[in-house]
Amino acid sequence: MTIMPSAPQPKPGKFARAVSAQIRSSMARQRISGAQLAEMIGRSQSYISKRLRDESSFTANDCESICAALGEDLAQLVVTAAHSIT
């Protein structure tokens, strides 16, 4: 079986960066590190770090898990992120 390399992912757009900014803000308010967040949602620290640095985008499932772990409202996070780029 031949495994084809995946195509490079596009850089996160404005909205994806706004979402990660909201997540970083919530983490800072709660004094939660990237390593702690990774453990809370069952992802690797590297996976979370790349997304917090806007090198990749969080998925919708990631956002749902992160909001649940941080006690944040997912809809509010999305609305706040959207308003920050308009």
Residue ranges of each PLM-predicted region?
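Short alpha-helical DNA-recognition segment
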Residues: 31-50
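The alpha-helix within a helix-turn-helix
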Residues: 27, 38, 67
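Short C-terminal boundary/hinge segments that cap the last helix of small helical domains
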Residues: 5-6, 60, 71-86
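Short, basic-rich loop-to-helix N-cap that marks the start of a DNA-contacting helix
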Residues: 55-68
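Residues within the helices of the helix-turn-helix
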Residues: 24, 35, 64
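Residue-level detection of the helix-turn-helix DNA-binding "recognition helix"
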Residues: 28, 42, 53, 82
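A short, Lys/Arg-rich alpha-helix, primarily the initiator
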Residues: 1-31
